[in-house]
């Protein structure tokens, strides 16, 4: 297979919205070439969305070796002021998309736009984008104030205005008294606040964050999650945030793009992503999820019947199954399952055996064997009247059909 022709794509300006547009014509074909008719239909839709998008990826592809794609036909648009998180496992393509937006990687095909303007050929330092990294990237030989002054000096901002902007940025992150210190004299959380202030000091419309809280302890990480989110909304800036931490994604974002194998598997607000996953990957990657394997025996509209592999039949909501006889993976969240349930006549009831009962402070976590699955989890609140189950104990489990989703096997 021939090598892909490089097309220079430097970073995006501030306030981006994400899209992805497909390959351009050239003498050589990309590793995968989209169907022309489908491409034209999608391109028409993308053009319409691009008119209102602040950040847009339009059919963007990325290959490092000219053979395989690490980002595949990515189409993503963001309105101004949105906080969007790119979430996925290692190698899913999320960080590559962020780097293309910043201008540190070039798109092999497709176009990236900021506020309606193509930025593929704009170098990173001219895109006007603020960036925050996990390693802070502070200059150790400079004071905090000097670190914040650097991006302002590059932009040739005068001394009096620089001082005003530095003070305002430090006050925003509650670090106004630390301007004279060096990074080595600060804690990890303080350094991250300074890194955030430096990204905001020149007032960008778009800020990119690459695993910014990954090196911090749990308590500090949770505190900064809320600070960053509140600050972004207060300032009205657009944020593209990359993480593999599901909790960060669900608590901080207006929308989450779940990546796998170079594609967005689902793009949705956090509650929709968790409550209504569109495929088995998203269901299992976001939060904790119980699965039962089976075969569709009936399907009509928004309801189907699934025969589990142990022979029992249950009702479910069909998501991406369409035919009788199709194999499916039933998805049920642990908190939607009750032990010895009182859910009414519509509830599904299955026999189960307790394998493990774990005390977790505010909740109990019970692992059971259900319909051939020995790792079926039930989460219950720690109440004064809570009965503590014992390994080997036989119990009945129940859940409502609306909480049961039939996904791709």
Label each region the model flagged.
Residues 36-39, 289, 299-409:
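Non-catalytic connector elements of ABC transporters
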Residues 56, 77, 113, 396-398:
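ABC ATPase nucleotide-binding domain
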Residues 87-89:
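The feature captures the beta-strand-to-loop junction immediately N-terminal to the Walker
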Residues 102:
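Helix-to-loop junction immediately C-terminal to a conserved catalytic motif
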Residues 108-111, 161, 261, 293:
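Conserved coupling/switch loops of ABC nucleotide-binding domains, chiefly the family-specific signature
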Residues 110-118:
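Conserved ABC transporter NBD signature motif
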Residues 124-130, 134, 138-284:
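ABC ATPase nucleotide-binding domains
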């Amino acid at each position: 297979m021939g090598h892909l022709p490089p097309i220079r794509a430097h970073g995006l300006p501030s306030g981006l919205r994400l899209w992805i547009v497909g390959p351009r014509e050239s003498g050589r074909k990309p590793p995968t070439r989209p169907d022309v008719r489908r491409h034209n239909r999608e391109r028409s839709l993308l053009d319409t969305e691009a008119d209102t998008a602040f950040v847009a990826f339009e059919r963007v592809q990325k290959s490092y070796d000219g053979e395989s794609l690490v980002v595949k036909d990515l189409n993503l648009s963001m309105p101004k002021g949105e906080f969007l998180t790119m979430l996925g496992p290692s190698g899913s393509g999320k960080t590559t998309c962020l780097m293309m937006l910043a201008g540190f990687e070039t798109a092999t095909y497709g176009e990236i736009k900021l506020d309606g303007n193509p930025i593929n050929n704009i170098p990173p330092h001219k895109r006007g984008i603020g960036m925050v990294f996990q390693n802070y990237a502070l200059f150790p030989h400079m004071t905090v104030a000097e670190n914040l002054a650097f991006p302002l000096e590059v932009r040739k901002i005068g001394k009096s205005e620089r001082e005003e902007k530095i003070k305002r940025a430090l006050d925003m992150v509650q670090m106004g008294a630390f301007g004279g210190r060096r990074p080595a004299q600060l804690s990890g959380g303080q350094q991250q606040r300074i890194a955030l202030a430096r990204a905001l000091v020149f007032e960008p419309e778009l800020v990119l964050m690459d695993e910014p809280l990954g090196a911090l302890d749990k308590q500090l990480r949770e505190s900064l999650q809320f600070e960053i989110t509140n600050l972004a909304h207060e300032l009205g800036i657009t944020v593209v945030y990359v993480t593999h931490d599901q909790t960060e994604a669900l608590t901080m974002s207006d929308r989450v793009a779940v990546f796998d194998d170079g594609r967005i598997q689902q793009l949705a607000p956090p509650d929709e992503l968790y409550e209504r996953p569109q495929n088995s990957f998203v269901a299992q990657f976001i939060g904790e999820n119980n699965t039962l394997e089976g075969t569709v025996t009936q399907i009509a509209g928004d309801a189907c019947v699934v025969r589990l592999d142990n022979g029992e039949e249950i009702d479910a909501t069909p998501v991406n199954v369409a035919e009788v006889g199709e194999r499916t993976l039933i998805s049920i969240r642990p908190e939607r399952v009750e032990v010895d349930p009182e859910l009414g006549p519509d509830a599904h009831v299955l026999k189960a055996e307790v394998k493990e009962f774990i005390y977790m402070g505010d909740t109990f976590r019970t692992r059971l064997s259900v319909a051939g699955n020995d790792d079926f989890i039930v989460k219950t609140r720690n109440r004064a009247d809570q009965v503590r189950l014992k390994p080997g104990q036989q119990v009945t489990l129940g859940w409502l059909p609306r909480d049961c989703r039939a996904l791709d096997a």
